[in-house]
């Protein structure tokens, strides 16, 4: 069995990960997969997720914990283990760092959202949240678009500074701005990506603040979490979700639905965009991702196959 840690997974090219995420959406369209509802256990502010999924060749199970307060102790908020197995024999093939898989595939989900929902003319963007996922979102944003100015906001100034320093090593040909407030970031950005576990909207907005912009919410995955104010979904020309499970799981969708700000039939699955060649020019769009085990499966299987080919990782025996 192959063991792949964070460093091994980090050697995989971003294009491989994003292609794997796109393959997951294609499987959604073809329905050639089996993805049971994930088990979602809450313990006060903390969450445990068990996420299984099956395809023709592989099946995968990810066990992930989300402890938001861990960052205050210098620890990552998300930890996890991914097991990839052969769907013919049932034999485990690989064990992987689940947090690294989550960070990479979720970054690619946001990146693919940027690629499909925006034009190449966008030059300004903002990231709300400077944790592991905020960094991953920034990397995939910059992989897909030549941004000239990137605004970053976090409650921790040190986290913002650290994220900027890390990004500069890989993407040096742009201006980085440590936003003083979320509102400053939103006003000055064409694309806004939120990667937080906020219990309440990160900012207040007027219609002029949001008109013609793309909003991507990545962080909220419980009904009591909401990153964006409901005026965005109310005024949006289009609302997309990676899975319809988001209508129940995330407060960014569930709360506006409960308050009758939007009707459920106005919410579309992002996978449908892969069948079209639609261009969204000057549209206000909300894309909400809560993630799904199918992303983990296609990402893990792509990484595994490339790791075997290139002799990446460590072989283990039970």
What are these regions (language model features)?
Residues 1-102, 111, 121, 294-297, ...:
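N-terminal ligand-binding/catalytic initiation module
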Residues 117-124, 210-211:
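Short helix-loop-beta connector
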Residues 124-125, 150:
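Conserved hydrophobic helix-helix packing surfaces used for dimerization/oligomerization
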Residues 130-131:
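Glycine-rich Rossmann-fold phosphate-binding loop(s) that bind the pyrophosphate
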Residues 134-135:
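N-terminal Rossmann-fold NAD(P) dinucleotide-binding loop
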Residues 143-170:
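NAD(P)-binding Rossmann-fold cofactor-contacting core
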Residues 173-256, 261:
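Rossmann-like adenosine-cofactor binding region
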Residues 221-318:
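Adenosine-phosphate binding glycine-rich loop
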């Amino acid at each position: 069995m192959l063991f792949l840690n964070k460093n091994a997974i980090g050697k995989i090219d971003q294009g491989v990960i994003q292609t794997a995420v796109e393959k997951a959406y294609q499987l959604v369209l073809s329905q050639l997969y089996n993805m049971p509802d994930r088990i979602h256990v809450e313990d006060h502010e903390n969450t445990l997720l068990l996420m299984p999924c099956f395809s023709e060749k592989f099946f995968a199970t990810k066990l992930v914990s989300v402890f938001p307060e861990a960052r205050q102790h210098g620890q990552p908020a998300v930890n996890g283990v991914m097991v990839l197995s052969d769907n013919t024999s049932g034999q485990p093939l690989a064990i992987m760092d689940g947090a690294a898989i989550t960070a990479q595939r979720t970054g690619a989900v946001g990146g693919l959202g940027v690629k499909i929902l925006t034009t190449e003319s966008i030059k300004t963007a903002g990231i709300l949240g400077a944790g592991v996922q905020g960094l991953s979102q920034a990397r995939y944003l910059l992989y897909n678009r030549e941004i000239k100015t990137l605004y970053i906001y976090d409650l921790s100034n040190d986290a913002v500074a650290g994220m900027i320093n890390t990004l500069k090593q890989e993407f040096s040909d742009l201006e980085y701005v440590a936003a003083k407030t979320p509102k400053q970031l939103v006003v000055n950005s064409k694309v806004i990506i939120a990667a937080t576990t906020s219990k309440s909207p990160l900012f207040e907005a007027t219609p002029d603040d949001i008109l013609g912009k793309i909003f991507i919410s990545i962080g909220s995955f419980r009904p009591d979490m909401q990153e964006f104010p409901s005026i965005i979904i109310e005024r949006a020309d289009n609302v997309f979700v990676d899975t319809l499970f988001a209508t129940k799981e995330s407060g960014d969708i569930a709360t506006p639905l409960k308050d009758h700000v939007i009707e459920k039939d106005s919410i579309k699955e992002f996978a449908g965009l892969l069948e079209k060649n639609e261009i969204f020019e000057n549209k206000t769009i909300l894309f909400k991702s809560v993630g799904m085990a199918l992303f983990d499966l296609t990402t893990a299987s792509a990484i595994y196959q490339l790791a075997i080919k290139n002799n990446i990782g460590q072989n283990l025996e039970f």
